[in-house]
């Protein structure tokens, strides 16, 4: 998106229009600006500045109002060239801490932690919050255990990167003793521990080729490697919260907007696509982290054209997850960026 240079006066007026529209959800007129902001400009002068901003595509006039509202281009200019993001303050941190304390979750269970983070971010931001767990292809395999369920079934339990546990039930086509199971567990842990799941998928046959003992059971494990050591399915990686908050915003007075939101929430693959697509990056000076912001038609999904998506990565060892919020373009960008950035930092520490 190309911008032409705005004068300081134009930048001031654009910034005020965006801030006032975010606060009041009503189109902003020149008289409102003249009365409420000490710019030292007359109503007529402000009106001329607004006309120039409209001609340049930064604001537009709804059919039913004399005021103006920001366009996608206006929001983008504001986010890229005007907005300054400060670090999160103690009051906000205390609110987040209180929200976490009110939730009942297991601090040792990664799925519980991610769901709790989504709930807190949704509640604090009043937007739809989404947390995506890391893809596990680059996660380190730590340990495998086999649990006998019956004479013909075993449960394979994988411990990954200290935090993630995967369980898969396998049908046995042969009888095995406890000693055979223990032998296979020891061998697999010895040969595979410390490798990434991708490395295991690509090399497990070769790594176990010289093992003749308990070969039938080993062959079953090797034959199931693509499922055992695969990435977590999308549906299991996605944690969504905050729908009850976002629908209270004025934008959702229109039933079609609610339907669009529901469609997005139900399409898990599209939701992951929205969050994992890198938008324009906004550096957050206070933390050194980058927050990605996609506004309106910058989003890949047509149902997301009236929304902004703000996301950032979080880190678990050498794996990367992503969290963020989805809300109307009329959002408090500085605050949302601060919250998303802080929650990612907190999540990285909680899962490390």
Curated annotation (Swiss-Prot):
Membrane spanning residue stretches: none
One Pfam family from the record: HrcA
SUPFAM superfamilies: GAF domain-like, Winged helix' DNA-binding domain
The keyword Transcription belongs to this UniProt entry's keyword annotation: yes
Keywords: Repressor, Stress response, Transcription, Transcription regulation
GO BP annotations listed: negative regulation of DNA-templated transcription
InterPro entries: GAF-like_dom_sf, HrcA, HrcA_C, WH-like_DNA-bd_sf, WH_DNA-bd_sf, WHTH_transcript_rep_HrcA_IDD
The organism's place on the tree of life at top rank: Bacteria
Any one GO molecular-function label of the UniProt entry: DNA binding
Biological role stated in the UniProt entry: Negative regulator of class I heat shock genes (grpE-dnaK-dnaJ and groELS operons). Prevents heat-shock induction of these operons.
Family, per entry: Belongs to the HrcA family.
Database matches in PANTHER family: HEAT-INDUCIBLE TRANSCRIPTION REPRESSOR HRCA
Record-given protein name: Heat-inducible transcription repressor HrcA
Gene: hrcA
